[in-house]
Amino acid sequence: MKLRDLVAYQHGAVVSRTLVGVEGGTVTAFAFDEGQGLSEHTAPYDALVIVVEGGVDIRISDKDYRLNEGEMIVMPANKPHALNAVTKFKMILIMIRASGKHNASPK
């Protein structure tokens, strides 16, 4: 199955589908309609965003990034972040639930 076929767009909405959910982390496919997003929040775990289709603006700790298809970014644990779909876009979100030192940086 192609990554872009894992989840379908829905008008005016954000759609998610959990692909893997285990104690050590999750892998989730998302489809955002244009203009949809996730308001600023924090997560206790590092999160890797892989853009499968379209474009997204991501803010991490007051720094802005624009990602397009084929690009990725790490949202470090406990750092405020938000997402806004520039166009319809799909992503894979990998949450890593691990204790210990965090070496993640955005790009």
Where in the sequence are the language-model features?
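Short, conserved beta-strand element in jelly-roll/cupin
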Residues: 31-33, 43-58
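A short, N-terminal "cap"/entry segment at the start of jelly-roll beta-barrel domains
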Residues: 1-24, 104-107
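Ligand-binding loop in jelly-roll beta-barrel domains
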Residues: 77-101
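A cytosolic small-molecule/anion-sensing beta-strand core signal
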Residues: 52-53, 68-69, 87
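Structural motif
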Residues: 26, 55-57, 64, 80, ...
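Short beta-strand His + acidic residue motifs that chelate non-heme Fe in jelly-roll/DSBH
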Residues: 38-40, 58-59, 75, 80-86
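Short acidic-glycine-tyrosine-enriched beta hairpin
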Residues: 62-77
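Conserved short histidine dyad/triad with adjacent acidic residue
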Residues: 13, 26-43
